[in-house]
Design a protein with these regions (language model features):
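Hinge/lid segment of periplasmic solute-binding proteins
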Residues: 7-20, 85-138, 152, 161, ...
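Extracytoplasmic "Venus flytrap"/periplasmic binding protein-like
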Residues: 42-115, 122, 144-155, 248-249, ...
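Glycine-centered hinge/linker elements that transmit conformational signals in sensory
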Residues: 164-166, 207-238, 282, 286
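Extracytoplasmic/periplasmic solute-binding protein
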Residues: 124-132, 137, 161-210, 255
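Short, solvent-exposed loop/beta-turn-alpha elements that line the ligand-binding surface or hinge
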Residues: 16-23, 100-115, 180-183, 199-219, ...
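Conserved C-terminal helix/tail region of periplasmic/extracytoplasmic solute-binding proteins
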Residues: 8-12, 19-25, 53-54, 147, ...
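C-terminal lobe and pocket-closing loops
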Residues: 13, 20, 263-278, 289-393
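Short, well-ordered beta-strand elements
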Residues: 22-33, 52-57, 80-81, 176, ...
Length: 425
């Protein structure tokens, strides 16, 4: 059994035997989600193995950035372990404890995670934590409408275009729920990156110069914009919609496809949020572009604060929290300590390929694993919000009929100025 009793000499998950940190209380700051509530409900297991007590603070996502930032500013060790969005990591890196030496000592291999998840918990070559909540992209589609019109699940973006045109003309609803809107969250880059990377282009080159203006990069961008401006397959409001608007559009039956995070699945057949029933909602891995699929992924790592006075005890907690068996059980068991929990989020590759995990979750992890085979993250630099906003604005303007190439070249010039000022060249 993977759960050894504390009387055994050898504990699971590379935990130290003999309870060297018994009596320590760790303060954990985490985002509000059933996945992490379930971890808290299981923490007696950790306490029985180590004698370490856990004190959890769960903060809603909208308030999380401010809360985590204040932990870094206070610098008083009030929280031993913090949970944050990967793109905030670079600005926190100076007060997060690198874990590479511990990983090596305890024989833990970060290759247990998909590449994008692994990268999301790193900064400048150092590992700062474990990606314990992470989201791949999937293409959700209306199974009933695809069946009705003899359409197959889209394997590439040409399939998306032809299915979108068929459904728009026959059903009078949007083929694809598009989100080209720009509101400061840079969500209109999420699908653009799939096109850019699959074309062999990138955001920056090895010199950190903007690389999206190569001929391949510009063609990929035009093809992404063309979904709306040329092919006309998008639902209403495409040029101003952000991701949430697109999710609502799909859930209300006003568009037949949406490329979005896997966590959206349960909401698409939740009667409080959606007009659709479960048998109308299907999903597939992200479509290929130019014969290749490269997807964007996002994660929420856990890291130890450099200001913690209990770093070794905190590392014991991190080992327990990130162990593959817990990851797996947490997506299978629907009740934890008497509380109903529904969670499909796993981050270990082994969990995504696990038969029981897939059986409990309509095989969504299997589709996610396909999306994640080739995957990447947004650039991990402190200047990314500024550069990303320039790109998001250019893409929004392009979707309204602006000159794609010119807009992207202008964004590149402005971005280069920002990065020059920051000392990259």
């Amino acid at each position: 059994s993977t759960v050894a009793s504390a009387g055994d000499n050898i504990l699971p998950y590379q935990l130290k035997s003999g309870k060297p940190y018994a009596g320590t209380t760790l303060n954990i700051l985490a985002v509000v989600t059933p996945q992490f509530k379930a971890y808290e409900l299981r923490d007696e297991e950790f306490e029985s193995l180590t004698g370490i007590k856990l004190n959890w603070t769960h903060t809603p996502f909208v308030a999380l950035q401010e809360k985590v930032s204040s932990v870094g500013v206070a610098a008083d060790g009030s929280f031993d372990v913090v949970n944050y969005l990967d793109s905030w990591g670079p600005s926190y890196a100076y007060w997060l404890e690198p874990i590479d030496a511990w990983l090596k000592r305890d024989g833990i291999d970060m290759n247990r995670y998909p590449e994008a998840f692994k990268k999301s918990a790193m900064f400048k070559g150092e590992t700062l934590g474990f990606p314990l909540r992470a989201h791949p992209q999937l293409m959700f589609y209306r199974k009933d409408l695809f069946d009705k019109h003899n359409l197959k699940a889209p394997k590439n973006w040409s399939d998306v275009v032809s299915a979108g045109k068929t459904i728009k003309s026959k059903e009078g609803i949007g083929g694809l729920a598009c989100y080209y809107g720009s509101d400061g969250n840079r969500q209109n880059l999420f699908i653009w990156l799939n096109f850019l990377w699959a074309a062999g282009a990138d955001v920056f080159d090895s010199q950190m110069k903007p690389a999206w203006t190569t001929s391949a990069g510009l063609k990929a961008t035009r093809d992404y914009i063309d979904l709306h401006t040329k092919h006309g397959i998008c639902g209403e409001g495409a040029v101003s919609n952000v991701e949430q608007d697109a999710r609502i559009q799909y859930a209300q039956g006003k568009a037949a496809m949406i490329p979005v995070w896997w966590w959206a699945y349960s909401g698409f057949y939740n009667p409080n949020q959606s007009t659709l029933s479960k048998d109308q909602v299907a999903f597939a891995g992200m479509p290929a572009y130019m014969g290749k699929t490269v997807t964007y992924a996002i994660s929420m790592p856990y890291s130890i604060s450099k200001y913690s006075k209990n770093k070794e005890a905190a590392w014991e907690f991190m080992k327990w929290l990130s162990n593959p068996e817990l990851d797996r059980r947490n997506a299978i068991e629907r009740e934890v300590a008497g509380t109903k929990i529904v969670n499909n989020v796993v981050t270990h590759t082994s969990s995504m390929l696990d038969a029981e995990v897939n059986a409990a979750n309509d095989n969504i992890q299997q589709a996610a694993a396909a999306s994640l085979k080739n995957s990447d993250i947004m650039p991990q630099i402190p200047e990314w919000p500024e550069v990303g906003d320039l790109l998001a604005s250019a893409i929004q303007k392009a979707s309204t009929g602006g000159d794609v190439d010119q807009l992207m070249k202008d964004a590149a010039k402005k971005s280069e100025r920002i990065l020059r000022r920051a000392g990259y060249y």
